[in-house]
A protein has these predicted regions:
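Beta-strand-turn-beta hairpins that frame and shape the catalytic cleft
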Residues: 7-12, 116-122, 182-187
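Short, glycine/charged-enriched secondary-structure capping and boundary segments
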Residues: 27-30, 55-58, 81-84, 136-137, ...
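Active-site environment of divalent metal-dependent phosphoester hydrolases
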Residues: 19-24, 48-50, 74-77, 128-130, ...
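N-terminal active-site segment of His-dependent metallophosphoesterases
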Residues: 1-65
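Acidic, His/Gly-rich catalytic cores of divalent-metal-dependent hydrolytic chemistry
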Residues: 7, 167-249
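Active-site neighborhood of phospho(di)ester-bond hydrolases with catalytic His/Asp-centered motifs
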Residues: 15-16, 40-45, 66-71, 123, ...
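Active-site neighborhood of divalent metal-dependent phosphoester bond hydrolases
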Residues: 56-57, 62-150
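Anionic-ligand binding region
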Residues: 139-189
Length: 249
């Protein structure tokens, strides 16, 4: 990543929901380099579901970017009750706990819930009780985060579906890939998922925010999805997690 000097315009690469998918993470980071991203931000859920949690944590730490806690990160270190997880998510959380090194657990335990930058904020799930990992899936959910937002812009993840809400009257939303954010309308942008997309597009997904021109682009990256799915099966994780990865749902 290019790095920035004081007062310079910045291209941010904002990504999350990696879910132990190292192949997808590598593809996203390579695309960020290609797209001249200056600074990366990770919205959490580095682990869970996928077969390479340790490698994903190592890579995120190596980048040295701002990183937030996701619910699966907390589940993997015993900071979140997994009884309400579905069966496959529970199995993956238990498997992930055993796969982590002590330094991985320490890192995941050190992550915060919200980060405020000069003209935007980032969170894993919702600004409405960020430590509860609530979802922003509906206009009602979005309204709660707008109430808590004191910046023009929020980036979030958690649902694995790129969806943008605009604080217009009435509220509007879009799934467009090109999002204008510089006109003063407060905006919530879901950046999609690197490692387990759920909008029926299996490509790795993240956002590029160019603060100089006031634009966000939801960016998709091809990678070897089948290889990542085979790693899930080889690790002894539920086969359903591999199948859904290839289907993007």
């Amino acid at each position: 990543l290019a790095g920035i000097g004081p007062g310079e315009a910045v291209r941010y690469g904002i990504f999350g929901d990696i879910h132990g998918n190292f192949d997808a993470l590598e593809a996203v980071l390579a695309e960020m380099d290609k797209q001249n991203v200056d600074e990366a931000l990770c919205l959490g859920d580095i682990v869970g579901y996928g077969a390479e949690p340790h490698r994903c944590i190592q890579k995120v730490r190596e980048i040295g970017c701002i990183c937030l806690a996701g619910n699966h990160d907390h589940a993997a270190i015993g900071k979140l009750d997994i009884d309400f997880f579905n069966l496959y998510a529970r199995e993956a959380a238990v498997w992930t706990r055993a796969a982590l090194e002590p330094e991985d657990r320490e890192f995941l335990g050190s992550l915060g819930f919200v980060e405020h930058l000069p003209n935007f904020a980032v969170v894993h799930g919702s600004l409405h009780g960020p430590e509860m990992f609530n979802y922003i899936s509906t206009i009602f959910d979005a309204d709660l985060s707008f109430d808590a937002l004191d910046k023009p812009l929020l980036f979030y993840g958690h649902t694995h579906i790129p969806l943008t809400f605009f604080d217009t009257k009435p509220m509007t939303y879009t799934m467009d890939a090109e999002i204008p954010v510089g006109d003063g309308t407060r905006t919530l942008v879901n950046v999609g998922s690197v490692g387990q997309p759920r909008d029926e597009d299996p490509r790795a997904c993240f956002a590029i925010y160019d603060d100089a021109i006031g634009s966000v682009k939801i960016t998709r990256v091809e990678y070897d999805v089948h290889q990542a799915a085979q790693k899930i099966i080889a690790a002894g994780l539920p086969e359903a997690l591999a199948i859904r990865l290839e289907m993007g749902k």
